[in-house]
Amino acid sequence: MHPFSRLFRNIQSLGEEEVQELLGPPEDALPLLAGEDLNHRVADALNLHLPTADLQWVHKTNAITGLYSNQAAQFNPHWIQPEFPELHLHNDLIQKLQQYFGPLTINEKRKLQLNFPARFFPKATKYFPLIKGIKNNYPNFALEHFFATANYLWTLWEAGILYLRKNQTTLTFKGKPYSWEHRQLVQHNGQQHKSHLQSRQNSSMVACSGHLLHNHLSSESVSVSTRNLSNNISDKSQKSTRTGLCSYKQIQTDRLEHLARISCGSKITIGQQGSSPKTLYKSISSNFRNQTWAYNSSRNSGHTTWFSSASNSNKSRSREKAYSSNSTSKRYSPPLNYEKSDFSSPGVRRRITRLDNNGTPTQCLWRSFYNTKPCGSYCIHHIVSSLDDWGPCTVTGDVTIKSPRTPRRITGGVFLVDKNPNNSSESRLVVDFSQFSRGHTRVHWPKFAVPNLQTLANLLSTNLQWLSLDVSAAFYHIPISPAAVPHLLVGSPGLERFNTCLSSSTHNRNNSQLQTMHNLCTRHVYSSLLLLFKTYGRKLHLLAHPFIMGFRKLPMGVGLSPFLLAQFTSALASMVRRNFPHCVVFAYMDDLVLGARTSEHLTAIYSHICSVFLDLGIHLNVNKTKWWGNHLHFMGYVITSSGVLPQDKHVKKISRYLRSVPVNQPLDYKICERLTGILNYVAPFTLCGYAALMPLYHAITSRTAFIFSSLYKSWLLSLYEELWPVVRQRGVVCTVFADATPTGWGIATTYQLLSGTFAFPLPIATAELIAACLARCWTGARLLGTDNSVVLSGKLTSFPWLLACVANWILRGTSFCYVPSALNPADLPSRGLLPVLRPLPRLRLRPQTSRISLWAASPPVSPRRPVRVAWSSPVQNCEPWIPP
């Protein structure tokens, strides 16, 4: 049935004779449909012209929202956070894969090396303050969302997915270290690594000098202060500048000599080392920055608990005695991570209590409330004092490694949303790394093959038994190099910065946090903390502290992640295909599809793949494993041997949305955008395709309103109620060729020549399209040869609207192949000339696969015939499945 038959008969401006002519033979009707006058008359009848600006736009329909009507995100206080298994790929993944699947191809090795480890080094990175770590997307549930997001981040850290920043050069995490992390290892399971101990022994002189400076600051008997030290050095530098007798290296040597002289009871001097000051400078000055860093980090690297102030002072006194007694030993060096010492200098103490490793006040908010009097009936003091032991302020992982300089900042904010539109009971973490997709920090992501609708039909439209697998937390399987951590930082500002009035307390030199912390004591915060304590218990104290974390596994908010995941899963699918040539294995992102000729054979393959993947460290989500039979549900489509159709839920959704569209009201372009995005998904299955939505496209590009008429709305409903499958392309030889000129057309086949003229001149692209439609109508060929690139592309939205809709209906399921004009046998008949007698060019269609293959050209694998397979199976006779 003609797609415009009912529509043309309902248009009063078209007479009966004109309607019969438009619905008549294609050689007469198609040139008329390309006429500009007819398209304007139909557009006026359907009210498809853009409305005037004085009309008031509609910004919301029953199901779709437009401009100025953003839907507020819904927060679920009872969100269930997912539990992540121990996601750790095998350390020798490539060697392990070769044991299972034989020698790998070059492409498979290249894809695996891209992911093991993944590398992300943008040219520029913007850093944001920690106050922007958790986005306030739910103003009515700000505190609940704050603690839920912090708990989600700590859950990821406990699963080994995140690094925890200890200081600017040290990271800690839980789990097993990878081989590239072994090179940066500092501590593993509470024991110092050998390489780290060796480097500390080599720099014992530098660390000892840093300890001497520490003792010098805390000793009252030493008359020389650090200010005098800097003045002496500056005086020497000024004198050397005036006289020109002292160089910069001599200034550094004098500084080291002065550090050695101010030692309390130390016997290490330059003269006793048996070397000249120049030699001493060469051995020590290279580590002078490390010495300064060791001194600074030793002041700020302590991890305290809210109740351990007395024990810390006792430990620090005993530790100071140990340092003074061992100061004469050459091999001794103080540890880098120790508890805060009780410095006698008030200036040093004030600097130490201001900032911790993450750049936040080290004064624990929990301890502050515990030590102060309650300010009222809703003071947080009542909650804090209910427990004697709230646990540590922070934790340390099993492994500590060195890292590049990691600032006290973040590169992206985080927030929680529903796991998917159909599951609002579970939460999902969203990481906003959008800075790498815009502005001067934009990164051009690599492209990879994505299967379109025709590719899926060509690859998977077969009569096989199907099974779909889902990789659990697929992105978090792929590790990232520790050098990329400074670019992928997330964190929490802590409860002390939760209130906006406390945001400036870290910049206040008087450290007025204790004076302003009671601004948190409100009835809402108090009641929310009581409910949160019922949920998290003692962990509430840990979640209230600030922290900075970096991704150890691949995050989902970076454009590089889909590319790397696609490479990883496609390499796995290629290896499985080589070892099971009798089955179909297809992977797209985290979805893996298996196909076999019998269900028993499919079960055997599934059990083997599950055991292999589990041994490699790849976790499959058993709950999402689905057996489809002969009807595969994949990427929202139903794929069978007869073709591809959309799932019923998408068809019902489109029908509901179209029926809810109001008639004769100007809808803003944002509503048109969202409605067109929904209709586009099913448009390839309709008779007119994307061309039916051209009036909506015109309104969107013009950024103006669009008015749905009752005729246009009913016509769209009739189109989307009748869907046709997208069938698989066949590899056939082209035997029909078409060509056209502005005044005529020509068709050549193996046994006849056809030609004709147009009643009026047409654009060359329009004439070529009409010639292709005539060739399809008169010969029924599903493969046509043409020399016009516009027709070859298959995109008909640039033609007149009526012609584009009818041409899409006629050419549905038709493929094209390019033939040069000099070799096109229909070229001369289109010009009204007799053709040259010569054989037709032999052109064969290759079905479109979008650079996606279902087989792997690789070294041959030795055939294996399992004896345990007793049923009739292709494995016994080694009959391979040949893809289309």
UniProtKB/Swiss-Prot annotation:
Sequence ranges assigned to domain Reverse transcriptase in this UniProt record: 398-639
Signal peptide (residue range): none
UniProt KW Hydrolase keyword: yes
Region Disordered, residue ranges: 299-345
Stretches for region Terminal protein domain (TP): 1-184
Keyword annotations: DNA replication, DNA-binding, DNA-directed DNA polymerase, Endonuclease, Host-virus interaction, Hydrolase, Inhibition of host innate immune response by virus, Inhibition of host RLR pathway by virus, Magnesium, Metal-binding, Multifunctional enzyme, Nuclease, Nucleotidyltransferase, RNA-directed DNA polymerase, Transferase, Viral immunoevasion
Residue segments, region Spacer: 185-387
Amino acids binding Mg(2+): 470, 590-591
Pfam family, one: RVT_1
Catalytic activity: DNA(n) + a 2'-deoxyribonucleoside 5'-triphosphate = DNA(n+1) + diphosphate; Endonucleolytic cleavage to 5'-phosphomonoester
Regulation: Activated by host HSP70 and HSP40 in vitro to be able to bind the epsilon loop of the pgRNA. Because deletion of the RNase H region renders the protein partly chaperone-independent, the chaperones may be needed indirectly to relieve occlusion of the RNA-binding site by this domain. Inhibited by several reverse-transcriptase inhibitors: Lamivudine, Adefovir and Entecavir.
GO MF annotation: an example: DNA-directed DNA polymerase activity
Residue numbers spanned by region Polymerase/reverse transcriptase domain (RT): 388-729
GO biological process: DNA replication; symbiont-mediated suppression of host innate immune response
Domain remark text: Terminal protein domain (TP) is hepadnavirus-specific. Spacer domain is highly variable and separates the TP and RT domains. Polymerase/reverse-transcriptase domain (RT) and ribonuclease H domain (RH) are similar to retrovirus reverse transcriptase/RNase H. The polymerase/reverse transcriptase (RT) and ribonuclease H (RH) domains are structured in five subdomains: finger, palm, thumb, connection and RNase H. Within the palm subdomain, the 'primer grip' region is thought to be involved in the positioning of the primer terminus for accommodating the incoming nucleotide. The RH domain stabilizes the association of RT with primer-template.
Main function: Multifunctional enzyme that converts the viral RNA genome into dsDNA in viral cytoplasmic capsids. This enzyme displays a DNA polymerase activity that can copy either DNA or RNA templates, and a ribonuclease H (RNase H) activity that cleaves the RNA strand of RNA-DNA heteroduplexes in a partially processive 3'- to 5'-endonucleasic mode. Neo-synthesized pregenomic RNA (pgRNA) are encapsidated together with the P protein, and reverse-transcribed inside the nucleocapsid.
Misc. comment: Hepadnaviral virions contain probably just one P protein molecule per particle.
Family: Belongs to the hepadnaviridae P protein family.
Name of protein: Protein P
The species this protein was found in: Woodchuck hepatitis B virus (isolate 7) (WHV)
